[in-house]
Structure formats: C-alpha cells, structure tokens
Amino acid sequence: MSSFINHHFYPSVCTSKHALPINPTSPFYLGIPNFRQKSRFMHLTPRCFSRQIDPLDKQKKRSFSVKECAISLALAAALISGVPSLSWERHAEALTSPVLPDLAVLISGPPIKDPEALLRYALPIDNKAIREVQKPLEDITESLRVLGLKALDSVERNLKQASRALKNGKSLIIAGLAESKKDRGVELLDKLEAGMGELQQIVENRNREGVAPKQRELLQYVGSVEEDMVDGFPYEVPEEYQTMPLLKGRAVVEMKVKVKDNPNVDNCVFRIVLDGYNAPVTAGNFLDLVERHFYDGMEIQRRDGFVVQTGDPEGPAEGFIDPSTEKPRTIPLEIMVEGEKVPVYGSTLEELGLYKAQTKLPFNAFGTMAMAREEFENNSGSSQIFWLLKESELTPSNANILDGRYAVFGYVTDNQDYLADLKVGDVIESVQAVSGVDNLVNPTYKIAG
C-alpha cells in the first residue's frame, strides 16, 4: 500500500497494537490491534509500536500483519479522500495520482449508506417502474431529519409520489416479475398498496413515531418484489471457479456474539445478508464455512476504530484448511463493477485502470462485510472477514480506497450499530444460515459430513 500513502517505512515488525500512519495526535489516528503475524515485506512495514513475539506464533505472523496494515492504510487514505480539509492533512505526503482523481468528478452526490437500500440497488434487475416507487419511500428518511411535526408534510409528499408511481406503473412492475414468482410478487404488491394507505393514516394522525417502522415495512415489500424479478442466476461464473462453493442468489445468516465485560450488552445477534448475485465465489465460500460451523466459538480478533475482524483459526494456518486436500482453500478477489454483468476476478480496479468505476457493493454502510487478504496477493482470501465501522460521510462511494480493492459480499442489516461495542476477545457463539442455503452450489460441508 506504500504506493498510495507515501509514509516513512521502517524495517520493523508490524505485529503491533498501534500503527502511526500520519500523526498520533490527530483525532483520526489509526489503532491496529495485534494479529499475531509478522510481515515478510520488511522494507515496506509501516512504523508500529511492536511487542515481543512468541516464537510459536512466528509462522502465522508472516502475512496478516500485512493485511491489517493494508486495510488500515487504505482506510486512512479513504478518510483523506472523504474529508480533504482535515486539519492533519499537512502532516501527510501527497497521495499519488491517478489513485485519487479529481474528487469533484468522483463524488456525484451523497452516498447511499443504508445497507438495505444498497442491497436493493445491487439486484440484477432493470425495472424503472419499481424504482420510481422505491425512491420516494427511501426519501422519507431524509424528510424525517426535519424536527418536529413539520417533517410529516414532507413525508406526505414522498408518500403521494410513491403511491402515484405504484398506481401508474403497477402493470409494468407485474410484467417484470419472474414467471415462477409472479403470484407471490402480486401478493406483495397488494400488501405494499395497503401499507401505503396505513402510512397515510399515520401521517394524518400526526404520529411521527409511527412513520419509520411503517416505512421500513414498505421498503421490505419493495425489496421482496424486486427479488422476485430475478429469474435464475444472471451469468456464468468463469470456468476456473465453477467447482468452488458458489452462492447463486442471496442468503441470510445470523451471527450471535457473546460480549464480555459490558454491563449494557451481553449477547448480540446480527442479521447479515450475503449477496451472491454480485460476489458468488466470496459469499459462497463464507456460507460454506458457516455450514461447517467454522466460525462457531471463534473470538473477535481485531477491533479498532475502523474495522472488526475475525476468521483466523488457531494453529499455524492463516485460513481454512480443506480436509479433502489438507491445503489452504483460497479464493480470488471478486469485484462487481456497476454496469457490468460479470464480476472482475483477480485484479483490483486500480490495476485495471478503472479509477472512476463504481462497485455494485460499495463500502458505504456501517457494517459492510468484506474478505480480508494479503496486501500483495489479490487471490489470498480464505476465511478472514471484516466489517467496516465508519460512516459513509467519511468513505463516500467511489472516493475511497477500499472500493475495488477488497471483496464486499454482504451487509449487516439488523443491529449493526452494536458492532461498535465488540472488542477483541468477544466470542462468536454461532453463525447460522436462516435462509438461502438452497442457493449454495458445490457445498463442501456436505462432503465433509
């Protein structure tokens, strides 16, 4: 990552609890928990506060300090790009072109940071009529930023726009439903229409508190209708990856975490939507590990101001060892670009010269879920995963270094705020699939029994 942030590098071991990317007195100082790894790229190691290394840990220390430093350095650059006027910018070396083109070109509008909205827009559909219903319902969130009952006037305008769009476009929406899902889709549209009437009554009763829950219910109907427009899996995965576990669709998992030493939080259950439409290899790999109970009993291994990370198994292995081969199972870097029908494999968007390309699954939402990898090996992802802990104002879409460099494959959609309460040593009691397992192709957990 040295080509992106021009730091001073020292031949020290990056196995530290804290790295100093720029200025330790800055409010955006990056803290990096220890990953028990040692970098083999000694000449490119950022200056760190190091600790004494256990000889038994040396083998595992080789590569994942590179991962933790790479991700944190990328996040540092993301902060710089997202907030170009930060007071500590004078302490940083200039970012090299063309990694960050003109921000005025990159930032075309406020980023979408709601994970469920991101998932709706990421579906492989092209139906303008349903989007015209979706958008004003989503705009209710912005309307509710107005204080007091005045917000309800804007909410009512949003609702009327959505109702009008549904009335005028209903036939086009129904025509866009997959034939096998048409009956269910029509039923959902009826519920959506009835729910809009209920929201209208809430507004007329001046019940501000009742708006947001009903809005979310309506948007869930919209999302379900849009999912019913997808007819099968929309493309062929490249031949070299077709025998891997693939998620051809979406799945939902629930992750239960035991939080230690926190009087306010004991157990957290996170609902995570895995998006196999845009990351079939990455999401399939993760779901296959979930079905193997790979993550059950594993601790949170990293938690700083930017990410929560886990997935490093005990022992010398740095990822999942496939029992059938007794070798590490790794997967390629997988990025779906906006406007493309098949993901890019094995290369970052920067390496391909796609500096202005937008990703279908951006690092916008608090709780964005992605695959960790070694900095200099794009196809080294295995089992280590991380969740983003930053608001999208600091990492706006298409203006942060993480987009196109790490494979996003899902979002936390329930209780994501509690990710900020997790810390190193908290235990993942279980990760269980609640839907979508039937979309998993080539599962190895069945072979393992």
Curated annotation (Swiss-Prot):
It catalyses: [protein]-peptidylproline (omega=180) = [protein]-peptidylproline (omega=0). SUPFAM superfamilies: Cyclophilin-like (SSF50891), Oxygen-evolving enhancer protein 3 (SSF101112). One of its GO terms (molecular function) is peptidyl-prolyl cis-trans isomerase activity. Keywords: Chloroplast, Isomerase, Plastid, Rotamase, Thylakoid, Transit peptide. Does not bind cyclosporin A (CsA). It is an enzyme of class 5 (isomerase). Its main location: plastid. This is Peptidyl-prolyl cis-trans isomerase, chloroplastic. The gene is TLP40.
